[in-house]
Regions:
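Short, basic-rich loop-to-helix N-cap that marks the start of a DNA-contacting helix
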Residues: 35-48
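Recognition helix of helix-turn-helix/homeodomain-like DNA-binding domains
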Residues: 23-38
Length: 76
């Protein structure tokens, strides 16, 4: 599952996640498109924010989606 589908499957938009994180939608887009990988701390923050929005996800799930996005972006 790609990052866009992951968020959609949870019923959460990038804008909602950005608001919960206190960052811009652009930051979220960069992370979820694989253009730039978030730090470990930010993956934790993303996981926490998603759960606060009702997504019921684990750190490992979020890390995997973000990692796959990064690998797809790099062409691996």
């Amino acid at each position: 599952m790609n990052a866009k589908d992951f968020l959609a499957s949870k019923g959460i938009t990038q804008e909602q996640l950005a608001q919960q994180l206190g960052c811009t939608r652009s930051n979220v887009s960069i992370w979820f498109s694989g253009k730039n990988a978030p730090s470990v701390d930010n993956v934790t923050r993303i996981t926490d924010a998603l759960n606060e929005l009702g997504a019921n996800v684990t750190y490992d799930e979020v890390f995997k989606v973000l990692w796959q996005s990064r690998q797809e972006r790099k062409g691996a």
